[in-house]
Amino acid sequence: MIKSSLKICLNLRRKSLLSVLFLVIASSSFVEATVQEPAADSDSSKEKYGIWVAGEDEGKRLQQMRLRVYPQAAAIPAFKHRLIPAANDRVDGNAAIFYLKAMGFFEQSRAQEQLAKLLRKWSDEATDEQRKLGDYPPYVWKEIEPESLPKEKVAQYLRLHSFQPEILYDAARRTRFEHDRAIERESNPIGYLLPSIQQHRQLARVQSLRCRFAIAEGRIDEAVEIVGQIMAMGVHLGTDEFLVSTLVGVALHGIGTDAGLMLSQQPETPNLYWALAACPDPAIDLKRAFAWERQFLLAQMPLLREVNEEIRSSDFWVDFTKRFAKVLNEFTKEYRDSFNQTSIEGWDELRIATTIARDYPAARDFLYEVYGMSEEKLDQYTKTQIVFLTIIKYNEFAQDEAYKHFVVPFATRTQANSSGIKRGSDLMEMWSERFSHSGQEPISSSILSLGDVLVAPSEHVVAAAAAAQQRQNLWQTVEALRLTAAENGGKLVESLDELSVPAPLDPGTNKPFEYESDGKVATLRASKINWHGREIKVELMSRDEQKEDNQ
């Protein structure tokens, strides 16, 4: 996955370390949680319901799902059911503490030991039977519809997590999500962040299984509550200060909405249109993360805070270069080890000095052409100061270009791409190529490339958050169809204009989803807004059609 994501990153001409990390986390989360490739030997006559599968429609790649849904009137009162707790039902407190308890098996060492033993047993059985990697519990269960789950095995697995539900109930009701990290003291913020954040995905997987098991046993109200808890965890992580966290939040939110779509197929499931309408919009709020992201370079390399426009002596820059060589060498080693880039060399004072001499003309041109610094002012700086000042200024420039994708409404970006956003991106691309020297890996060729090597690919982060909202709105549209069908004799509407409640909007177009109905089957199509390059298709069947299918 890392290698494939690196290729994606390079194809996008984004060569940053964080770009790769974001693509690895987000793409693996979406694929794992939502999309299944049909097996070559699968029975094509057997339809899967409530599960995303990869497919095509008129040559276009799609994420497709078939749903069988029952008409269901709106709840009375309208907010009888909640997915995200109401403000008056929330408690001031830190949800992160509760998630850590649930993930860390706090005072549950025996259960943790038994779980490890059980997983080893299932893994060994799969090896003995020469099954493919991951083709054993609990991983194989994510492909199974609730009614087909092996109840005894699932119950055995979930019993070892039986301490979690009460903790997760409390977590969903907390107002804040904060890890209170002393990030400014960390020499490697990336390595510091990833382990704890990634563990939330496993917690969401267990919750998803817990939800489907509740559906299988007819515990619908409990399943509704679990779906809300998964979504709340995604929303919580989305408020964290790091984009890595927000992307994991996107993945968790997707797991929750997928479980919700599965739940919508049950005849006893209450209508959740208004519960979804009351959920946060946007589902994943990127404001805090983008604010912190804009100073990530200085967090990763605090020494660069000493670089500014104040004229400094040559002696200062000799000492600064010595100290910076150690910092850069540590960062380069982390980059090389993380992505198996064995050809990347380390840095020492001599190599930095050689690079400064080579990069000085490009650095001076950048400060003159982009920032408008006068020749007289530039003449007062040493070559070393000009190069390091360019790193800071280029990072500022690159961050602002990336930030544009966040402040422009997602549905209007198509028009914007032909004007201001594209011009700025083209300018940044030009300087990026000039600084990186003939397409070499940036960290190995020029210290100037540090200006954008730690800039997140914000257009893809914004798209991921929009895709999360899109999925939630798709589910809400399904609930609108169920609600309206309950009012008009169980019939599907011919147009979303006929819905008795407002049609949710597709974030990719800021319009209702595309909709077709032949009276028996309706199809919802969402715009293509994520990097998988796939549309999302949902087919809906009326109550009468389901009765015929079950006979």
Show which residues each predicted segment covers:
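Compositionally biased, intrinsically disordered or flexible polar/acidic segments
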Residues: I2, V31-E32
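Short acidic linear motifs
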Residues: A33-Q551
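Bacterial N-terminal signal peptides
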Residues: S19-S28
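N-terminal secretory signal peptides that target proteins for export/translocation
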Residues: M1-L12
